[in-house]
Amino acid sequence: MTIAIVIGTHGWAAEQLLKTAEMLLGEQENVGWIDFVPGENAETLIEKYNAQLAKLDTTKGVLFLVDTWGGSPFNAASRIVVDKEHYEVIAGVNIPMLVETLMARDDDPSFDELVALAVETGREGVKALKAKPVEKAAPAPAAAAPKAAPTPAKPMGPNDYMVIGLARIDDRLIHGQVATRWTKETNVSRIIVVSDEVAADTVRKTLLTQVAPPGVTAHVVDVAKMIRVYNNPKYAGERVMLLFTNPTDVERLVEGGVKITSVNVGGMAFRQGKTQVNNAVSVDEKDIEAFKKLNARGIELEVRKVSTDPKLKMMDLISKIDK
């Protein structure tokens, strides 16, 4: 049997990618695919991936071909492959990559050879018909900065804290919408995941720090450490994005003295015991209690998956439960 391939994308593109490849090559064996739709999260995707793997022969290894680096299909696949030999994830799947990889499987390459071929053909398959190479000017050498004289310690003022460009509740944490739209539009230099649970999970913590977009660093800390970091003048003026999995952690952070004026609710997946308030957000009694406490502090609670969505008021959605 050949090396197994699983395609994972946002929306329903994965199935169509496979159908396009099969139109060129004929029906393929030992290939699976999963879609990713609103309301799902990494846990849902892991279940979907495992359901596909159960149908495939994984003896020679598994190659996950996903659409975007740091997106939810990538993040879920990364958690599966992290401790398995001959399991790999490649981001940027396109038709040239998929077709060449499927054809190469029939020649019984080694797992590493197939991975290298997939990456190479995916890159080579992206070309412009008429564009000419653009030469980049060499950057001018930077002038040496003058040494600043040491300043005496002083009490922290209102401008001596980090700037919170966005505080967002999204149980998918760093994924496509965060890594692309929100990071650019909020102009942050750091993404900080604030969660006791995630900070204690070494594998998940490591993966999250690897999926930040270019020019942005990612960190995972527990609530207590985030309070200490916020009060450290070393980070004064630095724009950051805070990501949470639930409103309880936000309320704990605010209770600890971190100044948050607005919270964006981007996604809280449905699971048993929760009530769905729209297609992306589900809450239980603990969530509702935390939202009420935040609302009582005068903190804006708005629901949007991406910045171009109209703002919905979280408390209005909660008020409609059981009506």
Swiss-Prot record:
This entry's comment on induction and repression of expression is: Expression of the manXYZ operon is positively regulated by the cAMP-CRP complex and negatively regulated by the Mlc transcriptional repressor. Expression is also weakly repressed by NagC.
Span of domain PTS EIIB type-4: 157-320
What keywords is this UniProt entry annotated with? Acetylation, Cell inner membrane, Cell membrane, Cytoplasm, Kinase, Membrane, Phosphoprotein, Phosphotransferase system, Sugar transport, Transferase, Transport
Pfam families under this entry?
EIIA-man, PTSIIB_sorb
**Where is it located?**
Cytoplasm; Cell inner membrane
Tell me where in this chain the PTM N6-acetyllysine is found. Answer: K55, K234
The domain section of the record reads: The PTS EIIA type-4 domain is phosphorylated by phospho-HPr on a histidyl residue. Then, it transfers the phosphoryl group to the PTS EIIB type-4 domain. The PTS EIIB type-4 domain is phosphorylated by phospho-EIIA on a histidyl residue. Then, it transfers the phosphoryl group to the sugar substrate concomitantly with the sugar uptake processed by the PTS EIIC type-4 domain.
**What's the name of the protein?**
PTS system mannose-specific EIIAB component
- Protein encoded by which gene: manX
